[in-house]
Amino acid sequence: MAEKYSVAIDGPSGAGKSTLAKAAAAALGICYVDTGAIYRTIGYGVYCRGIDPSDAAAVAAVLPEMRLELHYDQAGLQRMKLAGRDVTEEIRLPEMSKYASKVSAIPAVRDFLLELQRDQARRRSVIMDGRDIGTVVLPDATVKIFLTAAPEVRAMRRCRELEQRGTPQPYEQVLRDIVDRDWADSHRDIAPLCKAEDAVELDTGALTFDESLRLLLDTIRRRAGL
């Protein structure tokens, strides 16, 4: 059994990475690091300053001003702070998805956040999800998983999530946004979305949440020797 281990979960937007990773971390009693939330926090900081997220120079210039903090509440849930203010809810607004995707393609942003992410894995056993965890952030992760589902399935899941938050959007718009983001994330020059050679691919499209979680946990335990 690994004394300290790391689990890297990659996959496209809306594949259920965050929800499943949180549940798996709770079941295993380890820390969950939501890297998407970290990039969304940078995106939110850019948004609040009225900066074009595609303007790499302008975004890089304000990075030193962003006092970004990652901490965990009493329930063990990750919270994000920006300049001392908790922005965990604000960064989940639908428009922040595009901001996160654009700023995450900027080399200066990735360099700015890379050490913060790696430091979490050095400190403790973690499950970390994102787009390039197994290929760039934690290339030596104990377990690498590529979680996926068809765009249509992911759009339906996203619509339900938005409805529960009281911010519903039309299915067609959500699907279009997901397809557009898939293309952008897969074709960007810096750390494009791709499956690590040694990652296990799990397609949850036809599975319930409980079935998906069971499959994920079984894979982690087998690969990590738990």
Model feature map: region roles:
Residues P12:
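P-loop (Walker A) phosphate-binding loop of NTP-binding proteins
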Residues Y72, Q117-R124, G134-V136, D140, ...:
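Small-molecule kinase domains that catalyze NTP-dependent phosphoryl transfer to phosphate-bearing small molecules
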